[in-house]
């Protein structure tokens, strides 16, 4: 039996793919905050805030998204991990903590680099909270569906990145 997904427990998903390129080559792509907009059917792009012009711990950006059922929205995020050629992570601002945490991890191998993109929901408030509050009996299904959407977009991202090599 599958564990029931609860937003308060910060559910997550991730996808990985081995790409035949070095971490250095891939890092040049992954450190561009707009790269996923080329492949995602939801994320449309981002702009740096507060004078930032490149990723670094503490740098902030505003991302724009579009979803056929949710509509259009923007959110502000902060880079929380920046380890060149290894790991980049950002948290989406939410009430009471991050609404979500996103990132990429790279691990060099003899076949290239394993690139993992991941997303953790919560624990701060996000658009999912209203849906869950309206249908608390469907919390597991709402979260499972959203994680499936995120995983599908992450698969598209990694496939797109691989196509650039």
Where do the PLM segments sit?
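Hydrophobic-ligand-binding modules of eukaryotic lipid transfer/binding families
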Residues: 1-20, 141, 148-155, 159, ...
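Hydrophobic beta-strand positions in extracellular immunoglobulin-like domains
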Residues: 19, 65, 119-121
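Glycine-rich portal/gate segments that line the openings of hydrophobic small-molecule binding cavities
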Residues: 47-101, 111, 152-156, 160-164
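Hydrophobic ligand-binding cavity/cleft-lining segments
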Residues: 1-52
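Well-ordered beta-strand positions in beta-sheet-rich domains
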Residues: 14-18, 74-76, 101-103, 116-118
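Well-ordered beta-strand positions
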Residues: 18, 80-81, 107
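Beta-strand/loop substructures that line and gate deep hydrophobic ligand-binding cavities in soluble
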Residues: 94-152
